[in-house]
């Protein structure tokens, strides 16, 4: 079966091709071979065939097959990981779209203008009253918030934001009140029993009391018994000294000295400043504001002079005075104040005046009330007055002391580091409560015994027995 050609030539091939008696050679001669193909007969034949069909009106040779269509490109196979993530990505896009829609709805609710109110028939006076605060939004529990979908969570967040920015929200004033309370807080009930000064805590109070007592301020143990502050009895009977001229001399120039009931001596200076002196000397009765000045003063009653000048071998009781004296050899101390009687020089005018009164002056304004002795200074009179007081022997060491200072001296024996109380059998550096109670009972009994006979007869103890016939309690020591 022959194929159908697009040409109209249905004759045998040779006459159609123009093959006569000349044969194929004549056909080849009618079409000259192309240039460059003389060496390849197959290509020459194909070229001649294509030229022949082109001259006959055919697009291509009927012997050539139709070209195959180009291959259709195939989509690459999806990877397994992307296939698995497709549902997740789709769900995320849906949730994001839902959240955006919920936020837009909440914003529309917040920014929506209020609906026009209907005509009210209420009295206009009632409208002037302030509106009641709106009820608080319902609280959402934590489990419910966790279980809510993303869209519901966005709605809850938008509602919370609307409640926060509501115009009827109130401002808390509790922190401001607490700050004002802190600023106006009082110092507290920590008051010194000696000078009535207030402190904000117990530590500052104990540190302040150490100035009066001379003890180191330390932390009080929580289980320790707190004893009241005890004032030495000697401070209650410091003699009020005055000269014949009504308290002249030092007291008149620099102020006055007053004994107070709470214990101690209050000295008023010329500038009006009050200085409380709670530490008295056992030898002369002079009072000082702290233990340091008291101990330094006690050196004046001793004959020991441990400090010696390396230049002139002069000895001193105090190191500061020796150092001051050494400076005079080097010319470092300027002494412009000279004594007109002996030519001695002084660096301060008060030192010169004191020297003139004590050495060269014949005036003795400070006179003793119990004898005819007179003194140039108040300190000399105070040291002399102690001699007239009744001496009381110490039952521990036998030392004769004034009755006004025997209580201070007993502290050396009763509050020493090696003291053991005979009542409680404990070694302590503080006053034993049992010993203090026994001493108070003994003092009360001694006062009753020393009372007049008429008063003793009117008193009666238990069961009608006179007090004077009752046995006295034993001494605590």
UniProtKB/Swiss-Prot annotation:
Lineage of the organism: Eukaryota, Metazoa, Chordata, Craniata, Vertebrata
Quaternary context: Interacts with BPTF.
Ranges where the record places region Disordered: 59-78, 121-144
Gene3D superfamilies: Classic Zinc Finger
GO terms of molecular function: chromatin binding; DNA-binding transcription factor activity, RNA polymerase II-specific; RNA polymerase II cis-regulatory region sequence-specific DNA binding; zinc ion binding
Keyword Oxidoreductase on entry: no
Chain ranges of zinc fingers (C2H2-type): 190-212, 279-301, 307-329, 337-360, 366-388, 392-413
Keywords, sorted A to Z: Activator, DNA-binding, Metal-binding, Nucleus, Phosphoprotein, Repeat, Transcription, Transcription regulation, Zinc, Zinc-finger
Cellular compartment(s): Nucleus
Pfam families: zf-C2H2 (PF00096), zf-C2H2_4 (PF13894)
Chief location category: nucleus
Phosphoserine modification, residue list: 361
Protein task: Transcriptional regulator. Acts as a transcriptional activator that binds to purine-rich GAGA sites found in the promoter of many genes including insulin I and II and islet amyloid polypeptide.
SUPFAM superfamilies noted in UniProt: beta-beta-alpha zinc fingers
Name by which UniProt lists this protein: Myc-associated zinc finger protein
UniProt note on tissues of expression: Expressed in Purkinje cells in the brain (at protein level).
InterPro entries according to UniProt: Zinc_finger (IPR050331), Znf_C2H2_sf (IPR036236), Znf_C2H2_type (IPR013087)
SMART domains: ZnF_C2H2
GO cellular component terms given for this protein: cytoplasm; nucleus
